[in-house]
């Protein structure tokens, strides 16, 4: 019996390069990964950043944890393994956007170094900008 991997033929080396796409879009694609407690303002900040960059002529995509949980990760819970899988999935999606030359703003709680390191490894160190949103607990509880 053939394994599934026997029928997979990646074409990464044949597609138009990230650099060519960035040149076409006149921008330098990165993944801006906003992390912090739930309610810390990640999404609010992402929306403002998206609007500012878009008004300056940049192509931007927000990937928000709540939106992702209603779609490609709707079968996952909040166990440690499912949190890792959620971040793995979104990091792979982010990598696709970045490789298309699109600035990607991600809003995810990402509570552990293990989770953030996994995302950074998938997306690529050179394409990953991690930002911790430091908000006190009383702000997050509102």
What are these regions (language model features)?
Residues 1-32:
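Extreme N-terminal, non-catalytic leader segments
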Residues 69-77, 94-142:
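ATP-dependent NMP and nucleoside kinases share a basic, alpha-helical "lid"
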Residues 42:
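Conserved lysine of the Walker
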Residues 39:
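Walker A (P-loop) phosphate-binding loop of P-loop NTPases
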């Amino acid at each position: 019996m053939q394994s599934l991997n026997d029928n997979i033929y990646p074409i990464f080396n044949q597609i138009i390069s990230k650099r060519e796409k960035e040149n076409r879009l006149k921008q330098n694609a990165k993944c801006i990964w906003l992390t912090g407690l739930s309610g810390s303002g990640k999404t609010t900040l992402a929306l403002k950043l998206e609007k500012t960059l878009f008004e300056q002529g940049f192509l931007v995509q927000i990937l928000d944890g709540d939106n992702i949980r209603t779609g490609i990760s709707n079968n996952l819970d909040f166990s440690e393994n499912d949190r890792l899988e959620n971040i793995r999935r979104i990091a792979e999606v982010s990598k696709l956007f970045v490789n298309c030359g699109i600035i990607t703003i991600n809003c995810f709680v990402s509570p552990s170094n293990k989770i953030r390191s996994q995302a950074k490894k998938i997306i690529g160190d050179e394409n990953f900008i991690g930002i911790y949103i430091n908000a006190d607990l009383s702000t997050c509880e509102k």
